[in-house]
Amino acid sequence: MQKPKYKRIMLKISGEALAGEKKLGLDTDTINEISRNIKEVYDLGVEIAIVVGGGNFWRGRSGKGMDRTTADYMGMLATVINALGLQDALESQGMPTRVQTAIEMRQIAEPYIRRKAVRHLEKKRIVIFACGTGNPFFSTDTTAALRAAEIDAEVILLAKKVDGVYDSDPNINPNAKKFDKLSFMDVINKGLGVMDSTAASLCKDNNIPIIVFGLNEPGNIVKAVMGEKIGTIVM
């Protein structure tokens, strides 16, 4: 049997992806389907870390008239709801997990400790990172880049609602062009909406490739881990 291309991965799942067609809150069927896809990767022996967004409950930048710092902290708390929901779905399918938060809330999760996170991964536990970086003004994409660098992940899998990176929104422009491969400088200079410039710069500086792919297609996470050509690769 072919071996996975990557031994340790960082999977970034947006809050919107967890909401499914509802676009708000958590959709049980969607989370269970995502968990089944993750199980396929887990069964290959791959070490999996996950960063979840919180956009299905709250977006810091959408809090008009609100103090930005307060709005961002509200968004961090939203990621905890998603992390616990995903943890429950993963464990119901037999995968051991740990949730680590960048803001301490010991009654429901471990505080983020790098060495502990790495040890969990080595013991084949899935680690879910919540609360972003614990600091306002930083996105969960930046969290994924930062944690990936800290735990020595070999790749970031960026699960989106579209099947890659386009030169314009494919939902609006039917003639939008999809990119198979991009450089980090393309992402930073062209503002293609893959991730913010802080996250892209972190990945560039630490030589962490990013694979952007559609989460809605079953088996895509496995395909990415096995090295098949899907979505858009940024490197």
Swiss-Prot record:
Ranges in a coiled coil: none
GO molecular function: ATP binding; UMP kinase activity
Biological or metabolic pathway of the protein: Pyrimidine metabolism; CTP biosynthesis via de novo pathway; UDP from UMP (UMPK route): step 1/1
Enzyme Commission number(s): 2.7.4.22
Pfam families: AA_kinase (PF00696)
Keywords attached to this entry: ATP-binding, Cytoplasm, Kinase, Nucleotide-binding, Pyrimidine biosynthesis, Transferase
Regulation of catalytic or functional activity: Inhibited by UTP.
Chief localisation class: cytoplasm
Binding positions (ATP): 12-15, 55, 59, 166, 169
Subcellular location field: Cytoplasm
Quaternary structure, from the entry: Homohexamer.
Family: Belongs to the UMP kinase family.
Protein name stated in the entry: Uridylate kinase
Source organism of this protein record: Acetivibrio thermocellus (strain ATCC 27405 / DSM 1237 / JCM 9322 / NBRC 103400 / NCIMB 10682 / NRRL B-4536 / VPI 7372) (Clostridium thermocellum)
Biological classification of the source: Bacteria, Bacillati, Bacillota, Clostridia, Eubacteriales
